[in-house]
Amino acid sequence: MNSTETMADLSSYTPMMQQYFKVKLEHQHALLFYRMGDFYELFFDDARKAAKLLGITLTHRGKANGEPIPMAGVPYHAAEGYLARLVRAGQTVAICEQVGEGENAGSRCKAPMERKVVRIITPGTITDDALLGSYQSSNLVALCIQQNKIGIALLDLSASIFKVQQHEFKTEQLYIELARLMPSEIVVDEDLVDQNILEQIKKQIECSITKRPNVDFNLNNAQKTLCDQFGVTTLSGFGIDHLPLAKAAAAALIHYAKETQKTALPHIRSIQLEQSTDFIALDPITRRNLEIIDPLFEHGTSLFNLINDCQTAMGGRLLSRILMQPIRDTAILDARLDATEQLLIGYHESPVRLVLKEIGDIERVLSRVALGTARPRDLVQLRQACAQIPFLRHALLPAIQTKSSKLLNELDHELGDFKDLHQLLLSAIVENPPVLLRDGNVIAEGYDAELDELRKIRDHAGQFLVDLEIKERESSGIPTLKIGYNRVSGYYIELTRAQAEQAPAYYIRRQTLKNAERYITPELKSFEDKVLSSESRALAREKLLFESLLETLKKNIANLQMMSSAIAQIDVLANFAHQARLQNWNRPDFSPEIGIKIHDGRHPVVEALSKTPYTPNDTFLDSQHRMAIITGPNMGGKSTFMRQTALISLLAYCGSYVPAKSAKLGPIDRIFTRIGSADDLSTGKSTFMVEMTETSQILHHATHQSLVLMDEVGRGTSTYDGLSLAWACVLDLTKRIKCLCLFATHYFELTELGSESAIDNYHVTAKEMNGNLILLHKVQHGPASQSHGLQVAKLAGIPASVIKEAQKRLKILEKQQQQYFQTAVQNDLFAIPELPQIDETKIEIKKTSPVLDHLKQLDVDSLTPRQALEALYQLKDQLEH
């Protein structure tokens, strides 16, 4: 039974459950956290799901149609931990709070306390630190697809980032953009979205997909929605007036964010237009193979893990975004490099980093201020940041005095001056406030006279009671008379049963106990009213003052956001300088000419983790030398060399110094990788099928400005099939596509292509000493002489008996090959042998067959590379069966 089924007839339920159903009816898509006292309770299917996901007890409360109602709950004070787990599991949670008192409080038939949903937490709309890792971003993305065009919008509520783009719809390009944007949640039009596209997205990107009403994506209303949000009459200043699908996607995000946050979005004040051509394209496979953000293995180290020593969380998140979207504009890159160089001179980055260490996560604090969810300690973080601004500007002064870095000068200006705001927060908030406003004692003494007076009444209650107790003992003549308090009875004077007979006439009986009587007096009652009301009035006053502070901060939100952004950028630049000094990295140069020239390059992660000195290598590719075929033994360093070339290029196009003595790079539009081997068990694809699919993507989408890394193409099938494919791929990449390519292989026959134009042979060096193989990891010009496969197997621990047997077989095979070449006609490796003549008149062709029917139905021109390969496998399977 689920909650929806029970909503038809509510009359048999308690008032509280009737209220629950009414709220749940409006939020059927979400798990409803329904506040009941000190717990958030869940019922029916919500309870079952939460119990399974959170590992909490599933119990029951009352009955529905004669069956127990499933219930599960979590303590409200520990709810954040449970919410974080649910959001990580892709769930949406509606928080329903108690917002008032029940009616008829004095009667036995008390109405339920008023409740309402105060916010909806989804994977893409998180702003709470407790629900989001320090370096994680909560990116909400909307897709608006119509015919052959697509609009894409991104909103990060926690960082006030709002971006859009619109272009021709291509499935491959969409995957690349989603991999760059790293969405936590994708919003789509429930009426227009193609289910096949959604299924493919789910396979490519791990995130939640939420379907929204068509009205949210309405093209006619989008303009007004965005103009209202930004407080403008036209969007021409943002450059998106002519992009209807981009505007529709952006408007859909505004609608969704307002609905989930239950408030306006004052910190979303502008929108940025992006072009996919602004960035070097990195598909999901390349991002994974290069281990940019996440390592391939659980205990591995990614590039981000290695170089992220940013002193602020917002700096770390900015670094992550920079690594995920390397830019192609060399003017921006040189500005970053100039700033880094200026910080390196005289060790200026060190004092800057010391100041940055004292600054909290202001970016997220400001988002919570804007949304009205900021807590007292958020304002303390903001106060500390404002206090550090003068020190940060002073630390930057030596680096900007030469004015050689325009970027540093701009960032220094954007830091601003917040002395007045700092003074306001200093006078308004106590030094160490409690976590929650409702705990009181958040507003500092002396900030508000009315609050001080209410606190005085509350805080001096103890002394008043002591004085009153002494007074009553003396006037009544009862020396053991006591004055006490509890929440049920309030304040009281307690006498034993024996003493009750001596109670003065003005004592009014309040409560009778087994061995005592409790009384109230007019004076004590007056005091009680004053004290109890002062407590609640003080809390109400604090809430009012705190909200007033938030409103003041909202008025300064634009300048505060500029300050926050400047801090994050300075942090990243100082981190670049720190890494350059620490790792001995150097500044790269850019050239308009196609090519990659790296002298003594190193793999940054491998070098940092290696216990032995790293062997640097050169990379040389240009318009006359586009292809490097790399041969040599396994474990010799071929894959590491290829990856280091890609990572050095990536770092350079992020504006960072690079692990090389020098690096000069021409334009790069995309980096491809075909490295490693693995079955795709989820789709039933073999290692070879995965390899061919990835290779197909490269051959269809690489350009003359692409950097392509290909490792062991063709190894997943028979020797001649694999060699033929590898041979053809090398020629296609070199002659038709003309990209820059590093091609590692064990097919030594491919080295014959070194005589072709633009193709060079390289090998990783190794030598044998006393029967043992020593891998030198040096890349040198020319082909390898042998693969040293048996020696590598020996290093890997293969039993000696197996190695010995393999050596015997190797000698036999080598002898057979030598005899073959001595007697064979010296034909080209791929010369086609003469075939026996076939009498075509005797060939019987079946007019109909399932295979022919299948072929006739195929629209070959519309197939993607992946679909073409799958169709080929299906045809092969039909022939065999």
Curated annotation (Swiss-Prot):
Keyword DNA repair in annotation: yes
GO cellular component, one term: cytosol
InterPro entries: DNA_mismatch_repair_MutS (IPR005748), DNA_mismatch_repair_MutS-lik_N (IPR007695), DNA_mismatch_repair_MutS/MSH (IPR017261), DNA_mismatch_repair_MutS_C (IPR000432), DNA_mismatch_repair_MutS_clamp (IPR007861), DNA_mismatch_repair_MutS_core (IPR007696), DNA_mismatch_repair_MutS_N (IPR016151), DNA_mismatch_repair_MutS_sf (IPR036187)
DNA-binding recorded as keyword: yes
PROSITE patterns: DNA_MISMATCH_REPAIR_2 (PS00486)
Membrane-spanning segments: none
SUPFAM superfamilies, sorted: DNA repair protein MutS, domain I, DNA repair protein MutS, domain II, DNA repair protein MutS, domain III, P-loop containing nucleoside triphosphate hydrolases
Positions with a binding annotation for ATP: G632, P633, N634, M635, G636, G637, K638, S639
One of the record's GO molecular function terms: damaged DNA binding
Keywords for this protein: ATP-binding, DNA damage, DNA repair, DNA-binding, Nucleotide-binding
Any GO BP: mismatch repair
Summary of the function given for this chain in its UniProt record: This protein is involved in the repair of mismatches in DNA. It is possible that it carries out the mismatch recognition step. This protein has a weak ATPase activity.
Protein family per UniProt: Belongs to the DNA mismatch repair MutS family.
Protein name (database record): DNA mismatch repair protein MutS
Organism: Acinetobacter baylyi (strain ATCC 33305 / BD413 / ADP1)
